[in-house]
């Protein structure tokens, strides 16, 4: 016999089925789902919310909320155990590229700590999957940029 869904899982399923939710509420729900390690469901709820505001079914979130939602979508995508490992890392990176420049050779490269941290983690996982040294070097470069930005 399977155990019943948690309140958070039930809420996420309702969002996926079409229940409207405000961006701030969704961010709180995603935080709880991550604690429960239900990354796939969190990802699907974030994707549904994103599709709803892109298709103008709900109001567009503030720029700050949109950034946080996209960062959480990236995180939940690359941590979702049900997705193909290579594809999920590429998708997560694409979400981040939609927010900011990730070009380490450019002065326009993001200074956003969460984005840099996730980019470093994604490239580290790419290295773990492929053993390609270039991925590890790129990961370290993102973490170095993060360190420099924090140090000021």
Language model region names:
Residues 2-4:
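Short Lys/Arg-enriched alpha/beta "domain-start" segment
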Residues 6-47, 56-83, 108-129, 151-152:
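Amphipathic alpha-helical repeat scaffolds of TPR domains
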Residues 6-13, 41-52, 86-103, 133-145:
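Alpha-helical repeat scaffolds
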